[in-house]
Amino acid sequence: MGGDSTERGPDEGGADGHEPTVVDIQVDLIVAAFREKGIEVGVARCPDGTLDFLFEESVILVRDAYLPGVAAFLRRSDTDAAEQLPPVTGLLPGVSLLSLAGSRFPRVLEALDEIDARFGVGVATPSHILSVTPVHACPATEPDEVPRDTLPDPGPCEGGGGGVFIYVTDTGLLKDADDHPWLAGVTGQLDPPTGIPESPIHGYTGHGTFVAGVARCMAPVSQVRVSRDFDKAGALSEHELVKRLGQALGLGPDVINLSAGGTTRKNLPLLSFVTFWETYRHYKGVVLVASAGNNSTRRPFWPAAFPQVVGVGALAADRRARAYFSDFGPWVDVYAPGDGLVNAYATGAYTYREPPRIGQVRHFHGMARWSGTSFAAPLVAGLIAARISRTGENGRQAASSLLAQARAQHLPGVGPVLWPCDTGDCGDRVACCCGSRHGAVGDCRC
């Protein structure tokens, strides 16, 4: 499997009967959430027992050019009638979803091994499960409570984003999100309701609101819409995601933020996205920004690793080093602050589900401190939106300009970096990569 040669992150655990790790617990939550919807999730592990990838059982993705041959190969016997071929669902031009129910090889990994040997690697792949959780994704930690009057950090920039539309595909928007001034006017599909200190905060409720808050702080007058797509313990199958993204393109966004992703079988690109780019290229100017994952590895994390995507890693709290949890490598385009950010969150009681705080209960009052490349990505998405409104560039042009700036101010041993508006130790406002002030980052009296 693809994980044989990866550099593993510090939180990954095995399936050898030892105390559950963060990843083990998140896998169980995702498997249970999909099972409630009648969908079985397969768990592929590396030879050492660590997680390799998650996938939807009983279906595979197949390139259309090979579909007739693969479908015939999967018949239970050579004498099966044509009507007994596995059922097919067209997904996007170039790729189809093929059911393995009743086929010769009903289990995904077994079927793919046989297809690889017969037709070649990459003809068919699993429909991988992508996630906003620490299962090869983000955030890197569970949220920490902060006082109710805590201000967002990074705080709002000076204007920016006027006339720009940011689309956030995530877990949804909290009903009371616009109680926070920087989120006023943000729209979207609602997260499960909370609102009183005693009410439980479910799963990754609040993740989408936090992401939207970070983006809005960088582009305070942008139009932001949050779609509740990752509603199964913060996870979604790749073939469902590309359908949602296709619908999003029809709304005409300038920037799409995707704070989710995953690793794949044999580290191959997500097959559904390979064909999605054919649709994407017809929508001039829109840019997709995605988080690079929190596994502290250089293993490709998809879809951030695609060249068509702005893949965002996280800087540490001091903003001068890579965050310990952030993925890295040549496929990461830029690093931005993602450690200890503060923004809008749910109100209610949160029970920790991951080590080292399993079972502890904390009460949140509409704000939280959270870490992960999940939150570095919307910071960059917001900077792109702010630049669009300032320069008249479209999304892809603005992203290209900012990435050039990021390379020019790279940190040795880290890579290209972007910073938000901030203040120096002297209290002066320093320059921001969104362009709200001129000069290089760090221009102040310090």
Segments predicted by a language model, with ranges:
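Inhibitory N-terminal propeptides of secreted protease zymogens
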Residues: 14-126, 132
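C-terminal subdomain of the subtilisin-like protease fold in secreted/lumenal serine endopeptidases
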Residues: 249, 253-261, 267, 271, ...
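Protease zymogen maturation seam
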Residues: 2, 89-99, 103-165, 177-180, ...
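Active-site core segment of subtilase-fold serine proteases
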Residues: 141-223, 243-251, 349-353, 357-365, ...
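Extracellular S/T/G-rich loop segment that most often corresponds to the catalytic His/Ser-adjacent loop
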Residues: 170-172, 301-389
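Substrate-binding/access-modulating region of protease and related hydrolase catalytic domains
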Residues: 230-306, 363-378, 445
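Short helix-loop-beta-strand segments that form the rim/entrance of peptidase-like active sites
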Residues: 215-236, 240, 393-409
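Glycine-centered tight turns that cap/initiate beta-strands
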Residues: 120, 285, 308-311
